[in-house]
């Protein structure tokens, strides 16, 4: 099961991705995490990435694709994976398709989580994570079972992203609609796109996604 979750900031991709990970045992692959791991392990592509970053430049698409390719060759991806935050552009999406095809693989599905902009602002402003394990929470609709204690690891330390506030939501959404939303049409044309109502209760969104996945 090889998946991509699409949706604007605050749509709930992280929450739903973690539920898929827990149920199906496939890893959630973040480009940031993969990049740091490749640099730390000093893989060939990791060394290329480090040289670019040390020069103060942005890592190119071809290096990112190479890092993703290297990561999905690992044993824990043998039954599938979830791509988190990637691809972001049509160029990256096309390169990802070609990279998978070389391996004899293809995406199983692309799940779009749809949420209206005004709801996103409320969601983003209220979310926070466990500083220890990264489990996500929300002030209103996803609180820890015991106040101040992480459900997953028991930590009492939490943090909020500096850009998780109403002032930056508009800018982040504009960037999403300009760069990433064209992927919706791209994957629809390929017959891979499945849209779910991200404005429903969290468990209902999970149920809708499960309906999609069970039909693959």
Curated annotation (Swiss-Prot):
Residues that coordinate or bind Zn(2+): 130, 133, 150, 153
Binding site for AMP: 31, 36, 57-59, 85-88, 92, 160, 172
Entry annotated with the keyword Thylakoid: no
Region (LID): 126-163
Matching PROSITE patterns: ADENYLATE_KINASE
Enzyme Commission number(s) from the entry: 2.7.4.3
GO molecular function annotations of the record: adenylate kinase activity; ATP binding; zinc ion binding
Positions contributing to ATP binding: 10-15, 127, 200
Cited HAMAP family: Adenylate_kinase_Adk
Domains: entry comment: Consists of three domains, a large central CORE domain and two small peripheral domains, NMPbind and LID, which undergo movements during catalysis. The LID domain closes over the site of phosphoryl transfer upon ATP binding. Assembling and dissambling the active center during each catalytic cycle provides an effective means to prevent ATP hydrolysis. Some bacteria have evolved a zinc-coordinating structure that stabilizes the LID domain.
Subunit and interaction comment: Monomer.
Protein family per UniProt: Belongs to the adenylate kinase family.
Name this protein carries in UniProt: Adenylate kinase
Gene expressing this chain: adk
């Amino acid at each position: 099961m090889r998946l991509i979750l699409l949706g604007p900031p605050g749509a709930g991709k992280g929450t739903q991705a973690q539920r898929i990970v827990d149920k199906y045992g496939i890893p959630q692959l973040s480009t940031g995490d993969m990049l740091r791991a490749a640099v730390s392990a000093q893989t060939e592509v990791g060394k290329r990435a480090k040289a670019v970053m040390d020069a103060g430049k942005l890592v190119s698409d071809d290096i990112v694709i190479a890092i993703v390719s290297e990561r999905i060759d690992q044993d824990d991806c043998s039954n599938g994976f979830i791509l988190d935050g990637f691809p972001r552009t049509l160029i990256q999406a096309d390169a990802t398709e070609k990279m998978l095809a070389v391996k004899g693989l293809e995406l199983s599905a692309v799940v779009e989580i749809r949420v209206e902009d005004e709801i996103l602002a409320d969601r983003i402003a209220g979310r926070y994570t466990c500083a220890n394990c990264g489990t996500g929470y929300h002030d209103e609709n996803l609180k820890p079972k015991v106040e101040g204690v992480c459900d997953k690891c028991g930590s009492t330390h939490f943090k909020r992203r500096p850009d998780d506030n109403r002032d930056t939501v508009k800018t982040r959404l504009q960037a999403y609609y300009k760069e990433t939303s064209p992927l919706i049409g791209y994957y629809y044309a390929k017959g891979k796109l499945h849209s779910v109502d991200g404005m429903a209760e969290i468990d209902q969104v999970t149920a809708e996604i499960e309906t999609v996945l069970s039909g693959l």
